[in-house]
Amino acid sequence: HRKCPRGNWGTCEFTLARAFNFRINTGVSQLAKRDVSGDSFNVVTLKDGRELIVLSDGMGVGRKAARESKATVNLLEELFNTGFGQEVAIKTVNSVLMLRQRESFATVDLALIDLYSGEIESIKIGGVPSFLKRGGRVGIISSSNLPIGVVEDLDIPTERRAMLPGDMLVMVTDGVLDPGKLIDGRGLWLRDFLARTSEQDPHRLSEMIINKALALARGEPRDDMTVICARVDRNQG
């Protein structure tokens, strides 16, 4: 970045920034059970060179759930951009939700991808499993803790993995996985679906997953559905 005064005289200021080694190509698909989805998400590049992907499912459906999940997502983004660490940021949001007079619960599914190293940090608070696809192999990221805003002493498990160009992260809310429980009892149909598909475009893949989940629900979603697909690519710029 260069900043120079107008005219022929003066001092120029230069700001040098290290180029990212990776970039994230993201596709999102949503389907609401009612008129307003209770799921909220955001994808943003932080000042420290990490890509923040956060998905939150407010308890219930409709406008109340949407308010809880949106507040969670917005506050997390603000705290991370201010420079807070993962544990402090999540515990701050947890405290804010617990201070509200009425019950305020929300899941947090969070991924931080280092655009220099390719390392991903996954934090899951009450959310359903996420999936990491590399070719025909699919890994599962899961946790068994309570949603945010339920207990004061919140456990924050963090899982780190190395990602390579072409790897795909798939994050979903429970409305996507739950219809498959009628098939396998666990709702992990998506793992097998991802292992079989060769689709690499995150936008098309997110639509395919939503359509499959809707078919499993026989055309009538029992809950809000959100799918985020994020592919890691080598930065050519």
Residue locations for each model-derived region?
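Short strand-connecting beta-turns/loops that link adjacent beta-strands
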Residues: D48-G49, L115-S117, N235
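Short beta-strand-to-coil "C-cap" segments at the C-terminal boundary of structured domains/repeats
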Residues: A17-R18, A230-Q236
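Catalytic core of PPM/PP2C metal-dependent serine/threonine phosphatase domains
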Residues: H1-G10, A66-G135, I210, L214-D223, ...
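Active-site-proximal, acidic helix/loop segment immediately C-terminal to a metal-coordinating Asp/Glu
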Residues: G60-T82, E152, M163, D167-G219, ...
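PP2C/PPM family metal-dependent serine/threonine protein phosphatase catalytic domain
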Residues: A17-S40, I90, N94-M98, V128-R160, ...
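DG-centered beta-turn motif at the end of beta-strands
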Residues: D57, G127, V172-G175, D224
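N-terminal entry segment of metal-dependent catalytic domains or homologous docking segments
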Residues: G7-G58, K64, A71, I156-E159
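Acidic loop->beta-strand submotif enriched in PP2C/PPM serine/threonine phosphatases
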Residues: D35-G49, F105-V108, I140-L182, A217-R222
